[in-house]
Amino acid sequence: MNNEINNELNEIEVNDAETSDIFEEEVNLARSESREQAFMLLFSKSFDDEPLEETIDDNSEMFVGGVCAYAQAVVSGIEDKHEEIDEIIASHLKKGWTLSRISKPSLAILRLAIYEMKYLDNVPQSVSINEAVELAKKYTIDESKFV
């Protein structure tokens, strides 16, 4: 599944310059911490339909110094490209599987990794994949193999 997704994403040349600029400006947080914030926001957002700004405000107390700009930009980008990202995931599921069968943490991790690989030209795909696996090991039970 990973090879198929990688091949599909390699064929697409899309650059989200605004998110890339914010990513470069993130000096206070390690990239993995920024991704973890983005994951936590995505996971939290999966439980309600409130606007993204409210999700960020509601969760900003969890993070020392608030939510970083990179996490906000990535989650906003994922929200904008939600249908396209979910189509990519769904197209690689086994027969009979739907997105609703995937746990919320695993789905948030997959969305984050696919967004980075498809829309951010300054993040190597190998880094996105590795970070996704690390998040899955930390936040899922026996589902890290799925990611």
Regions found by a protein language model. Give the residues of each.
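N-terminal interaction/assembly modules
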Residues: 1-146
